[in-house]
Amino acid sequence: MAAAWDWNCITKYSKIEPMKTRDQLIDDLLTLAFAEDVGDGDATTLSTIPADEMGRQQLIVKEEGILAGVEVARKVFEKFDPELKMTVSITDGAHVKPGDVAFVVEGRVRSLLQTERIMLNIMQRMSGVATMTDKYQSRLDGLKTRVLDTRKTTPGMRLLEKEAVKIGGGSNHRIGLFDMILIKDNHVDFAGGIPQAVQAAKDWCAANGKNLQIELEVRNTDEINQALQAGVDRIMLDNFTPERTLEAVRHIRAYKAPEAQLASDPHCHNGEDVEIESSGGITIDTLRAYGECGVDFISVGALTHSVKGLDMSFKAC
C-alpha cells in the first residue's frame, strides 16, 4: 500500500520547525498568498468599489476535466472575509465541462475581487493535477496497477497537489522525506552498498521507534537479488524497459525468503508479497505496457511538475 500520511512525524536530526497539521499548512499557504498578492490592499478595487457594495460571483468552468479544490476555495473566502457566503453546486472529483457553474459566492464586492485570483490559482492548479491524474489512471483500467505521484511538486503546494492526485483517482507516494524510507543510488553509494544501507535503515527505525516502509531503488538483476535478500517492503525498478520490467516482476514474484528471516524481520517478504514500483521516464503512452507487466505502482512526476491548469473564470452574476 502507499505510504501513510503522518503529519506528526519528524526526526530528531531535523533543523526545521516540527511538522504542522494539514489545516496549519493550508493556512500558512493562504497567508503567504494574500501577502504577495493583496499586500496592504487592492489599489484598483479600493479606489473604484464602495466599501458597502454587495454582489455575487460564480465560478464558471471553461474546459473539460476533473474539478478539485472546492473546499480549499472555501477556506480562501473564509480567511479573507468570514461573512462571504459560498453555495456549492459541484463538488471535488466531479467530471466537469465548459459552462458548468461550480459555486456562487456572495458578499462584499471588495472581498470577492481581492480573493478572486488566489482562489483561481489554487482551483486551476488542483483541477489540472486531478485531470492529468484521471487521464493516467484511466489508461490502467482493468489492471491492479496504481499511479503514484512524486515529490516533484510546487513549493508550498505539495499538500494540495497530492490531495488533487487522490481526487483524480491516483494514489500518493510518500508525502515528504519523513514518512517513508526510500533508499536510492546515492544513499547506497554513501552507505557502502545495498545490504549496509538497508540494515542501517532498519536499525535507525528500531532505535527511533519508527514504523516506516522501506523501499529500495534498483537498476539491474543483481541489485534486485540484493534487495530481496536484505528484506525490503517495496522495490523500485528505475528506468527499466517494459521487457526488463516483465522479467524483473517474474523474478521477484518467484523469490522465497528464508523462514527464519520471515519470522524475525517485518520488512522481509516472499516475492509475491513485495510491492513493485516502476519509475523513470514513463509517459502516458507507455504507461499501460508497464502496468501489464504486473507492477503494483507506477510513479509519474508529470502529474504535478508538468501539468496545465484547468481553465475557469470567476464572474459577476
Residue ranges and their predicted role:
Residues 239, 280, 302-303:
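Short secondary-structure boundary segments
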Residues 258-272:
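Intrinsically disordered, low-complexity segments enriched in serine/proline and basic residues
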